[in-house]
């Protein structure tokens, strides 16, 4: 499996997927699926986490992703909610633009700043891997990291830059 960061450097897994799969949600936390109308929530989390430097750019990006998936976000984008039902994080999987068939990308990992560095990013990555398992014909996963914190998280989970 490979990982790609924003600078287009690649990574691969060290066969340490047990670090990813052996996660459980804290009491009261849950995953909810993205639904049409959730665009502002998604953009707010992405912008707050520093994935996008401009809120409007984040809004444009989610609509672009919706269009490319023709609105079929089922099992493609999720939110992590805390015990109060507040959406605090999100992650998405999309078909890769590479010419190789069956490649899925894990993208847009983001957590609100006060929830970062608490192990919750690992939960989102675990959920994304499980979502990829449900994609028919998925053969490989690319990871995309947009900031240094995401890159460090992926490396701590056993991925290496190629």
Report residues per predicted region.
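A short beta-loop-alpha structural element at the N-terminal edge
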Residues: 30-42
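Acyl-donor-binding surface of acyltransferase catalytic domains
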Residues: 1-28, 35
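Extended, hydrophobic alpha-helical segments in both membrane/secreted and soluble proteins
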Residues: 105-106, 141, 150
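Conserved acetyl-CoA-binding loop-helix of GNAT-fold acetyltransferases
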Residues: 111, 117-132, 156
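Conserved active-site alpha-helix within GNAT-family acetyltransferase domains
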Residues: 122, 147-162
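Conserved GNAT acetyl-CoA-binding A-motif
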Residues: 132-146
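A conserved beta-strand-loop-helix scaffold within acyl/acetyltransferase catalytic domains
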Residues: 47-111
